[in-house]
């Protein structure tokens, strides 16, 4: 991890594919152990989204029991001792480390998938590092946040969907949401990678058989926001 340029005392947001890494003794648990040990002085964050199962027909997300739709390893991570999960109904995050509860606090009051004041916004505020481990830019949910904060066209719906979260105390919390509505989703995010490389925002590396993509949140937002200012519909086109 050190050779990749990751700051162990900072905040690290990880999107990963265990399959892409190749053979790992102990499978995914070993990888989670490695990440947790390396980031022990800081904060380790993984996605724990539930947008695939929570919606109009099933409007309730239970922070303890609703499974993540972001891969088997993220589900294993959120169940680990010491890991906390945020109370966002569709785009929750799981965090382990220094100030996990503070970082995740208040997500039940955020009305968009990655809205201002929420955990994804805090990644920008603290200039977190984002590691794409064996996955590409289409898995970089932070960019959805930039769309929301910086005026991308067609990012979220005008109307709200009535959703609820059951918190750690078993209480049901009403948290209506403007949901993602882009017809292309995150499929166009890969268009941003060449610019990020050219501007020195993105660093490529290797971990096992997987390509790693490492970047800092603030310069990434600055780059994408500048593109959206010139062309608010840029990420709606392939």
What are these regions (language model features)?
Residues 1-238:
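N-terminal and secondary-structure boundary signal
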